[in-house]
């Protein structure tokens, strides 16, 4: 089954986030990986046809990615 352009964008963004999480220092990278997984799982139930909301989440996620991927950001705490 062929993926839509938006699905490809989400998958590409997910992989970029995982790569950035793995690049964080030990032992923090495990928490970063858990954070990435949690954020994407949290939105897993969104309808594939809700394009505007998915695009909104990609924009918000991109801003978070830029903030969190800065070298001075070492650790993350979430619940």
Swiss-Prot record:
Keywords: Chaperone, Mitochondrion. It comes from the Eukaryota. One of its GO terms (biological process) is mitochondrial respiratory chain complex II assembly. It is found in: Mitochondrion matrix. InterPro entries: Complex1_LYR_dom, Complex1_LYR_SDHAF1_LYRM8. Belongs to the complex I LYR family. SDHAF1 subfamily. Plays an essential role in the assembly of succinate dehydrogenase (SDH), an enzyme complex (also referred to as respiratory complex II) that is a component of both the tricarboxylic acid (TCA) cycle and the mitochondrial electron transport chain, and which couples the oxidation of succinate to fumarate with the reduction of ubiquinone (coenzyme Q) to ubiquinol. Promotes maturation of the iron-sulfur protein subunit sdh2 of the SDH catalytic dimer, protecting it from the deleterious effects of oxidants. May act together with SDHAF3. Interacts with sdh2 within an sdh1-sdh2 subcomplex. This is Succinate dehydrogenase assembly factor 1, mitochondrial.
